Structures are given as structure tokens and as C-alpha cells.
Regions:
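Conserved catalytic cysteine-centered active-site region
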Residues: 1-53, 86-112
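Short, intrinsically disordered, charge-balanced linker/junction segments flanking boundaries
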Residues: 1-5, 171-176
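Residue-level signal for alpha-helix termini/capping positions
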Residues: 32, 59-60, 168-171
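Short acidic/polar capping segments at secondary-structure boundaries
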Residues: 33, 43-46, 56, 71-74, ...
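Beta-strand segments within the central parallel beta-sheet cores of soluble alpha/beta enzyme folds
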Residues: 38-42, 63-71, 134-142, 175-176
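Short, well-ordered, mixed-charge alpha-helical segments that flank or form enzyme active sites
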Residues: 48-50, 74-78, 148-149
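Condensing-enzyme catalytic core mediating Claisen C-C bond formation in acyl metabolism
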Residues: 96-174
């Protein structure tokens, strides 16, 4: 409270710009985007879930076109210390730091944090065909299943359920 009443107040928009939806709102403001706006928070699955939710919004006719994506920027001291406390970070390879990241190697020792972002523009097939767009892919199914297992150790049954829901939504069988 001392700092609060010291006269060093925060900027008026600090809370609004720090909220979970701030990036989504800023992108919409910058580009005049209207329609469904959603900020998805599902750890490593956030961007995949956002794409699935966008596909559903298009399917249900809530929009003709949707910008969807994900980003992560955890490389700040507090985040690194927190991940280190979990004891899941890879041991640094002092001779060849790029070798520290080897996710499919038998000698892997943990994960290496990174930063990144990507965005896609998804649209209804009818909209794309009307404008003569080259169609690169079709999203035909989405499934999302929490497994109520553990924060960092998913239950394979939950992963299987998500795949089953995706196949069911797409009208496909596992062997297709």
C-alpha cells in the first residue's frame, strides 16, 4: 500500500493491457477485426484448441473468415526459474548448446524453452471458393478432452478421448 499511495501510480490501462485477452483485443483493434474474439488458455494445447474453436465458429456460421493463432514468450528470469524448479529443463550441453534440445533422442534430458508465434487465416470453404482462393487444407474435425489427471503428466486415456472426439466430429474411423 505504501507504493500505491506514494504518487507513483500505474498507467490507467495497465490492468486492461495485462489481461489474458489483451493480445486478441489489440490485434482486433489494429486491424479492425470484428466477430468472435476468444483468448484460449490450455498450456501447450492453446493454439491447437484455438484453431479447433475457430473451425467450429466457421462451421456454425458465426463468421466467414477468422484470424487464429498462438504465441508464447516465456524467456524471462522468473519463468525460467519456475521451470527450473520443476526440474524439467534439459541439461545444457556445454560443447554444443544446440544439442541440448533433442526431444526424440534416447539421451534427452528435458525440455528447452523457446518463444514463438504463428497466425493463420481460416475461412469457410464457400467463401474461399467464391474468391477463387487456393485451398491448402480442410479442417474436418476437432476434439478437446481434459483428463483431470495431473498438471504436467497427461493421462493417455484423456489423449485417446480427444482423438476419438476429433475422429467422430470428422466422420472418420481410426483406420481411415
Amino acid at each position: 500500500y505504501g507504493r500505491l499511495h506514494s504518487g507513483e501510480g500505474a498507467r490507467p490501462l495497465t490492468i486492461l493491457l495485462a489481461m489474458q485477452n489483451a493480445a486478441v483485443a489489440q490485434i482486433a483493434l489494429d486491424h479492425g477485426l470484428r466477430g468472435p474474439q476468444l483468448s484460449v488458455s490450455q498450456a501447450c494445447a492453446s493454439a491447437a484448441a484455438a484453431i479447433g474453436e475457430a473451425m467450429l465458429a466457421l462451421r456454425w456460421g458465426r463468421a466467414e473468415r477468422i484470424v487464429v493463432g498462438g504465441s508464447e514468450a516465456p524467456l524471462v528470469a522468473g519463468q525460467l526459474q519456475a521451470w527450473d524448479a520443476l526440474r524439467v529443463l534439459a541439461k545444457a550441453d556445454k560443447l554444443s548448446p544446440e544439442q541440448s534440445c533433442r526431444p526424440f533422442d534416447r539421451r534427452r534430458s528435458g525440455l528447452v524453452l523457446g518463444e514463438g508465434a504463428a497466425a493463420l487465416v481460416l475461412e469457410r470453404e464457400s467463401t474461399a471458393r467464391r474468391r477463387g482462393a487456393r485451398i491448402h487444407a480442410e479442417l474436418c474435425g476437432y476434439g478437446n478432452a481434459g483428463d483431470a489427471s495431473h498438471y504436467a503428466r497427461p493421462d493417455p486415456a484423456g489423449q485417446q478421448r480427444a482423438m476419438e472426439l476429433t475422429l467422430q466430429d470428422a466422420g472418420l474411423m481410426a483406420g481411415d
